[in-house]
């Protein structure tokens, strides 16, 4: 009795890389304290990923990016933008716009 494809041939299946590139393990435990805090937060919340836990996830990913364990990525693309982040971005763009308008020569 043979198993597999007809004719008894073995089929080679090539593994596919992750969609966003490699995600190396944190062997040195550089970000371990943050991920343990995140997991405790999830446990306290009964598995609900509320804003407090999401902020911990953001700091974990930021730590991974800082230690070159993950390619730098905009948090907006990762779905980790919060109200205070939006306010800071709006204030920064408003001050940049005001500064550029003050530099314009008046006619």
UniProtKB/Swiss-Prot annotation:
This is Cytochrome c oxidase assembly protein COX19. A motif (Cx9C motif 2) lies at residues 53-63. Residues 1-22, 87-107 are annotated as: Disordered. It comes from the Eukaryota. Required for the assembly of mitochondrial cytochrome c oxidase. It is found in: Cytoplasm; Mitochondrion intermembrane space. Its main location: cytoplasm. InterPro entries: COX19. GO terms for biological process: mitochondrial cytochrome c oxidase assembly. A motif (Cx9C motif 1) lies at residues 31-41. Keywords: Cytoplasm, Disulfide bond, Mitochondrion. Residues 28-71 form the CHCH domain. GO terms for cellular component: mitochondrial intermembrane space. Disulfide bonds join 31-63, 41-53. The keyword Hydrolase does not apply. Belongs to the COX19 family. The gene is COX19.
């Amino acid at each position: 009795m043979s198993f597999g494809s007809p004719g008894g041939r073995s089929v080679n299946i090539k593994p596919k890389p992750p969609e966003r590139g490699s995600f190396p393990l944190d062997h040195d435990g550089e970000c371990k304290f943050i991920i343990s805090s995140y997991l405790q937060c999830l446990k306290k919340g009964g598995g609900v990923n509320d804003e407090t836990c999401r902020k911990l996830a953001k700091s974990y990913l930021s730590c991974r990016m800082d230690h070159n364990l993950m390619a730098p990525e905009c948090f907006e693309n990762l779905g980790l933008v919060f109200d205070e982040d939006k306010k800071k971005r709006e204030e920064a763009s408003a001050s940049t716009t005001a500064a550029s308008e003050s530099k314009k020569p008046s006619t």
